[in-house]
Amino acid sequence: RDRSVSRGLGDVYKRQGIIGATGMVGQRFITLLSEHPWFNIKVLAASSRSAGKPYKEAVGAKWCMDEDIPDAVKDMVVMNATEDVEKIASMVDFVFCAVDMKKDEIKALEERYAKAECPVVSNNSAHRHTPDVPMVLPELNPEHIEIIPSQRKRLGTKRGFIAVKPNCSLQGYVPALFPLSKFGVKDVLVCTYQALSLIHISEPTRH
């Protein structure tokens, strides 16, 4: 893998973990990041059912990406997302979180990682309404990360924090609408078809 891009950007190359790595979103994180020049997947974590197994065995027939499981991760032993928090935090610079749990459980788990001084970039909706958690589309509102010091004060952390992304449909069209807002656009009709996104997946593998 060519590291020259990351070196040219001030050594932004980072070690990261994926929490919820066996689910569909976790799989997508893997395909996007396994060859990314800025990132190095150091940890894959999932539920106790998958923990302790090589990733290719843990995900098994649930793998639903068009690409094969990347060689870099297929033999990586899956860690326990809820029991290995401190250990995971010590191994990475930050984590991407895509766990499939109840919202209150997700909120608690993400705060545990943050309090272990591990920054969390969350794909989940659990913290989208937490006042001091920034929900960022970098092209639109990068200044929202300025709330992080307040969040750290609440959590009692020096480095750890939580940041979230918006709903997946919004990130597709809002960046295009944003520059049009100055022209006085008042109404927009948007149709999304998220319920169809899993139609090609067989029933046992839907999560």
Question: Model-derived features: where do they sit?
Answer:
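Conserved acidic residues
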Residues: 10, 93, 118
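Single conserved hydrophobic/aromatic residue that forms the stacking wall/gate
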Residues: 1-13, 199-207
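A structured beta-alpha segment of the ubiquitous adenosine-cofactor-binding alpha/beta core
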Residues: 66-107
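Rossmann-fold NAD(P)-binding glycine/threonine-rich loop
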Residues: 104-157
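N-terminal Rossmann NAD(P)H-binding glycine-rich loop of SDR-like oxidoreductase domains
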Residues: 22, 26-30
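Conserved anion/nucleotide-ligand pocket segment
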Residues: 20, 164-202
